[in-house]
């Protein structure tokens, strides 16, 4: 047991080194903000609906905030340790399923690989409820294979408490593994009365920003990533064929949900994300196959480690590959956000370029999560929340339209935002902006009052 734990610990360290760690990145703009508001309810007095409403159906933010209160560990370290624990639990579950270290090692180095047609990776570079749910689901798969169904049910309930959609995929997968003959023709039953409510034009504009909602727009290689796993899994005996049937069933369900225009409200359920579980189990099986030859394994494994690490470094070139908790940030945008957190009132209301996350050098760090201040809606991440919470659509559209032409804004435009929404601060990346008092400057990047 100590030897196995030591190997799992080493593989977890390897996985974290390859994956990297970036708090506040991408979806963590929501999750970290929600946890921080749970710890300090005074935060985000103007815009908490853009993350709070989704968290009504999950215990994730309560769980992480509760662990901080219980242990008195700083949140940045608590989030890092939860991420490490989630990766460890995923790899431990993979070992329990396959009993082959080669397969577990392959999964460890491929955690950052994109999943076709879904907009996600196997594991994110920050703490995400999907990672915790994935660990629970994989352990439920292991318990199902061992016919320990009560434990599997408890684990799936745990997954549902933090990420209901991942839990649904886990339930489906476990049913196919336990009772393949009895579920291949079973349809999914959901309370879908809300699906047929008419969608607003504002909601459609927000949903249109999510390319993975529209399968007919996918590239050929994305379709290859959807269909090839079925053929690969079919080669791995009874276990592989049961997983293939699971993949086929979920694919049919996903297409039935995503293609008909009348079911457009179902698209935010992201039914193609069942592929995350399929990819994990497929790589686990492939790793075991490659590992039967030591030399073949070395030839595959070492280049994969180097290549996957290099890809992650290049994906966020202006940030350290691992943004360690408690360290001084080197990314100029993150430094500005940290300054905002320490030097502006808690009830401040900010405006930024609505596409600031995609600005070169920003590296997709979320303002709310890192600055801990309210901000007008953006055009990159907030539309995804609008798609899930349609009542936000009109507000998002109004704020988005008000910020149209941001790159040419001057003091008069910012005063217009102040009159319309109450904005009293802006973050600008344009040295040509004049007429504002800007107490923070770092090159062209400035934090300015709107008075």
Locate predicted features.
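Signature aromatic-anchored transmembrane alpha helix within multi-pass, membrane-resident enzymes
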Residues: 4, 186, 291-316
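Transmembrane catalytic cores of multi-pass membrane glycosyltransferases
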Residues: 16-32, 39-57, 164-170, 176-279
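Extracytoplasmic
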Residues: 314-451
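Active-site lumenal/periplasmic loops and adjacent helix-entry segments of GT-C-fold
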Residues: 13-91, 97, 101-110, 114-135, ...
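Transmembrane helix irregularities
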Residues: 70, 144, 158-166, 371
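Membrane-embedded alpha-helical segments of multi-pass membrane proteins
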Residues: 81-89, 127-136, 167, 171, ...
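Membrane-interface transmembrane helices that cradle and orient dolichyl/undecaprenyl
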Residues: 132-151, 178
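Start-transfer (signal-anchor) and selected internal transmembrane alpha helices
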Residues: 1-14
């Amino acid at each position: 047991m100590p030897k196995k734990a030591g190997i799992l610990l080493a593989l977890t360290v390897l996985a974290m080194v390859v994956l990297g760690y970036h708090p506040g990145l991408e979806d963590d703009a929501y999750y970290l903000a929600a946890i921080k508001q749970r710890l300090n309810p005074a935060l985000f007095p103007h815009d908490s609906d853009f993350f709070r409403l989704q968290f009504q159906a999950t215990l994730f933010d309560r769980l992480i905030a509760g662990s901080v209160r219980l242990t008195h560990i700083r949140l940045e370290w608590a989030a890092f340790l939860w991420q490490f624990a989630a990766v460890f639990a995923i790899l431990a579950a993979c070992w329990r399923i396959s009993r082959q270290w080669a397969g577990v090692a392959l999964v460890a180095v491929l955690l950052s690989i994109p999943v076709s047609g879904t907009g996600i990776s196997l594991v994110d570079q920050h703490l995400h409820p999907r990672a915790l749910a994935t660990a629970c689901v994989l352990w439920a798969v292991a318990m199902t294979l061992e016919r320990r169904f009560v434990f599997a049910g408890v684990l799936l309930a745990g997954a549902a408490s933090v990420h209901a959609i991942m839990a649904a995929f886990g339930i489906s997968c476990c049913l196919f593994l336990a009772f393949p003959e009895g579920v291949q023709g079973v349809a999914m039953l959901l309370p879908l009365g809300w699906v047929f409510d008419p969608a607003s034009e504002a909601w459609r504009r927000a949903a249109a920003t999510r390319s993975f909602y529209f399968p007919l727009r996918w590239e050929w290689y994305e379709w290859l990533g959807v269909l090839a796993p079925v053929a690969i899994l079919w080669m791995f005996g009874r276990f592989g064929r049961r997983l293939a049937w699971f993949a086929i069933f979920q694919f049919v369900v996903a297409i039935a949900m995503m293609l008909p225009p009348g079911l457009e409200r179902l698209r935010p359920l992201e039914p193609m994300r069942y592929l995350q579980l399929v990819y994990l189990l497929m790589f686990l099986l492939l790793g075991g196959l490659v590992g039967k030859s030591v030399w073949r394994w070395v030839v595959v494994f070492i280049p994969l480690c180097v290549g996957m690490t290099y890809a992650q470094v290049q994906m966020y070139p202006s940030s350290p590959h691992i943004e360690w908790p408690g360290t001084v940030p080197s990314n100029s945008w993150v430094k500005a956000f940290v300054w905002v957190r320490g030097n502006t009132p808690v009830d401040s209301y900010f405006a930024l370029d609505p596409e600031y996350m995609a600005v070169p050098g920003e590296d997709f760090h979320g303002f709310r999560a890192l600055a801990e201040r309210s901000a007008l809606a953006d055009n990159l991440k907030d539309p995804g929340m609008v798609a899930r919470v349609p009542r936000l659509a009109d507000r998002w559209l109004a704020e988005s339209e008000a910020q149209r032409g941001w790159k040419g804004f001057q003091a008069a435009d910012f005063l217009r935002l102040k009159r319309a929404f109450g904005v009293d601060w802006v973050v600008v990346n344009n040295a040509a902006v004049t007429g504002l008092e800007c107490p923070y400057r770092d090159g062209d990047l400035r934090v300015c009052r709107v008075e």
